[in-house]
Amino acid sequence: QSGLDYLEWFAEEAKRIYGDVIPGHMSDKRLIVIKQPVGVTAAITPWNFPHSMISRKAGPALAAGCPMIVKPAMETPFSALAMAYLAQQAGVPDGIYSVVTGDPVAIGGEMTTNAMVKKISFTGSTRVGKILMKQCADTVKKMSMELGGNAPFIVFDDADIDAAVTGAMMSKYRNSGQTCVCANRLFVQAGVYEAFSQKLAEQVRAIKVGNGLEAGVAQGPLISQAAANNAEALVNDAKDKGATVLCGGQRVDADANFFAPTILTDVNKDMRIASEEIFAPIAPIFKFETDEEAIALANDTEYGLAGYFYSRDIGRVWRIAE
């Protein structure tokens, strides 16, 4: 549904692509800005939301009058191909919405170096984003990028704990923790640390893992064996450095990619899980004492994208937000 919502939104917004009239340096002159299509655009999309991420990129491009070439993730090509088929059935002219699948290095290299492509939109890792930016430099392409995330989730001692637990469930375990805006590091003030951890654990233990087509199942597998192996490695590293597994902590099936929804307590910043993007249903909970400590911990990352915090003190809300 979110993919359809994107298309509808951008189709309507295309009616409001306004220009600007800017006062000139002389009283009898006006500067007029008219927005026009940039030209052929390309999108490199991730696997975690294979339909909606394409709609989010192709929707505004097509609405603005720009042909779009999509390279979907190798793990999830079928959504893009199905959209190409539907576009053809709907009467979209050939060449306006195109899909290319295959070797990501070769396709990405062509997109970044071909002078016909005027703009690239990419969602993925920071490492790959840097490579694409370097490759685009020779043709000075416009770029829009959404890169890796390491979102902090802060719970202050005056927060509504039940609301914070509900928020953590939504922002951490959605899509098995495989979103770039997932809560990656949970910082909880000492006064409510135990209460929050136990209430969250009650909710997490109730998550049913399995086939997403079965009734009651809320979490499916991770995208690949490599992803499950990485989740396992992060938990083991944290345990080796003193973390406590409050729940989960291992694969549901040793031969599959289902990973149990996990909570780690007694976490510290020396653990890999404190600095790496997790992309798994693992919630590491850090304890803090003061507002200043929470801000320092939250900002101690090279990533961005999102942040969450819970408090009922309006002064604290503004101070932390700013």
Language-model region placement:
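Rossmann-like NAD(P) dinucleotide-binding subdomain of oxidoreductase/dehydrogenase enzymes
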Residues: 6-9, 19-163, 288
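Residue-level signal for inorganic ion chemistry
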Residues: 7, 65, 97, 120, ...
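ALDH superfamily catalytic-core signature
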Residues: 119, 127-268, 297
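Conserved sugar-transfer catalytic core signal across GT-A, GT-B, and GT-C glycosyltransferases
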Residues: 56-58, 234, 316
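Well-formed, non-transmembrane alpha-helical positions, independent of function
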Residues: 60, 110-111, 167, 237, ...
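Conserved C-terminal structural/oligomerization subdomain of aldehyde/semialdehyde dehydrogenase
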Residues: 117, 154, 208, 236, ...
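Structural detector of well-ordered beta-strand residues that form the stable sheet scaffold
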Residues: 69, 98, 144, 246, ...
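Thr-Gly-centered strand-to-loop micro-motif
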Residues: 64, 70-71, 122-123, 182-183, ...
